[in-house]
Curated annotation (Swiss-Prot):
Gene Ontology biological-process annotations: enterobacterial common antigen biosynthetic process; fucosylation
Keywords, comma-separated and alphabetical: Cell inner membrane, Cell membrane, Glycosyltransferase, Membrane, Transferase
Catalysed reactions, semicolon-separated: beta-D-ManNAcA-(1->4)-alpha-D-GlcNAc-di-trans,octa-cis-undecaprenyl diphosphate + dTDP-4-acetamido-4,6-dideoxy-alpha-D-galactose = alpha-D-FucNAc4-(1->4)-beta-D-ManNAcA-(1->4)-D-GlcNAc-undecaprenyl diphosphate + dTDP + H(+)
Protein name from the UniProt record: TDP-N-acetylfucosamine:lipid II N-acetylfucosaminyltransferase
GO molecular function annotations of the record: 4-acetamido-4,6-dideoxy-D-galactose transferase activity; fucosyltransferase activity
Pathway(s) it belongs to: Bacterial outer membrane biogenesis; enterobacterial common antigen biosynthesis
Designated gene of the protein: wecF
Keyword Cell membrane part of the UniProt annotation: yes
Gene Ontology terms: cellular component: plasma membrane
Function recorded in the entry: Catalyzes the synthesis of Und-PP-GlcNAc-ManNAcA-Fuc4NAc (Lipid III), the third lipid-linked intermediate involved in ECA synthesis.
Mode of membrane association: Peripheral membrane protein
Class of this enzyme: transferase
Localization annotation: Cell inner membrane
EC number(s) reported in the record: 2.4.1.325
Length: 359
């Protein structure tokens, strides 16, 4: 039997760390198909912190792709599980036959599915990538992303799967220590990545609430982002008074980030695709409602779990936000499909499907 190989095809430290830690701590002990990884980027201590995994690192996305293609050609029974897929060479290999459809299983992370960049090289590449995506052996994704993908590729198998957000289930029913009243605190975006469209989001928040709310913008990740942080701060200060705007430019440890989220009353996410599920989960767990773009299909996942959804096109005010908080507080968090530990069983199923051991 050939063991499934997992591929992290792009050097995205935060996401890669989350996946590797999840596999090491949760999946590797029970499945031999959860131990082999090929990773773009440097070790950065992963080998030491993930002793249950066999990790091979490659200095570039191209070097990793070449190694994957060589393995695929050497053994056509070798299957790969691609987590996110931000690697042009791998898509082209699927198009050219270097990797066969039966060897290619893909966990959609959102950004790798949607065609949102206006850069020329992306606009030229998107049609090729779209064709390649129709040739994969199967996909795993959120309900909304499965629906989006199926409209383009109805014949490709799709299975429900959620990114393994780091969560403590014991916090689901945690008593609220903070009385939710007074000035609203609004979280804008889930990171400092430009895909959060921070400036447009700040303008939208101002249009809805004016300079009457506290606005918190976490921008400590990714690194080397100071010019964009300054740009967002300047735009924010043109709208909000200094005491109402908090731009966080330092990377935060998980517990500190969790504490920050729990001080908020609302999450505001303007991007028109699925992303930031981890932050959404942590907000929902704390009974903090989220405002989504109606083009972000994750609203389908939330509605399926009977969670209140607010949209950027809604008329928002404190009364609407407090009512959404009340509705969230009445939900039994232990039954939410995309919460830990409920997302575990779909991962076990996904491993068996990608490895060819399940129909």
């Amino acid at each position: 039997m050939t063991v499934l190989i997992h591929v992290l095809g792009s050097d995205i430290p935060h996401h890669n760390h989350t996946v590797l830690r999840f596999f090491n701590d949760t999946l590797a002990a029970t499945s031999e198909h959860a131990r082999e990884f090929m990773v773009a980027g440097e070790d950065n201590g992963f080998t030491e912190s993930c002793p249950a995994l066999s990790l091979r690192f490659y200095g570039s996305k191209k070097a990793l792709a070449q190694a994957v293609i060589a393995k695929a050609k050497a053994n056509r029974r070798q299957r790969f599980f691609f987590h996110g897929q931000f690697n042009t060479s791998l898509w082209l290999a699927l198009l050219s036959g270097g990797i066969k459809p039966a060897q290619f299983y893909w966990h959609i992370w959102g950004a790798d599915l949607y065609e949102v960049s206006h850069g020329l090289k992306f606009r030229l590449f998107y049609p090729l990538r779209r064709i390649a995506q129709g040739r994969v052996g199967g996909v795993f994704a959120t309900r909304g992303d499965l629906s989006y993908f199926a409209r383009q590729h109805p014949d490709v198998r799709g299975e429900l799967l959620y990114f393994p957000t780091r969560m403590d289930p014991s916090l689901n029913a945690m008593a609220k220590e903070r009385q939710r009243a007074g000035k609203l605190t609004i979280l804008v975006g889930n990171s400092g990545d430009r895909s959060n469209q921070h400036i447009a989001a700040l303008r939208a928040v101002y249009q809805q609430f004016g300079d009457t709310v506290n606005v918190v913008v976490p921008m400590g990740y990714p690194a080397n982002n100071q010019d964009y942080i300054d740009e967002v701060r300047q735009a924010g200060l043109a709208l909000f008074s200094a005491e109402n705007l908090q731009i966080l430019s330092e990377k935060m440890e998980f517990d500190a980030y969790l504490a920050l989220l729990r001080q908020c009353d609302l999450g505001y996410f303007i991007f028109a695709r699925q992303q930031g599920i981890g932050t959404l989960c942590l907000l929902i767990q704390a009974d903090i409602p989220c405002v989504l773009n109606r083009d972000n299909p994750f609203w389908q996942d939330m509605a399926e779990q009977h969670l209140p959804v607010l949209f950027t096109t809604d008329d928002l005010n404190e009364q609407v936000v407090r009512e959404a908080q009340r509705q969230l507080a009445s939900v039994d968090k232990s039954g939410i499909t995309f919460f830990s530990p409920n997302y575990l069983q779909p991962w076990h199923n996904a491993l068996r499907i990608a490895a060819g051991e399940a129909e």
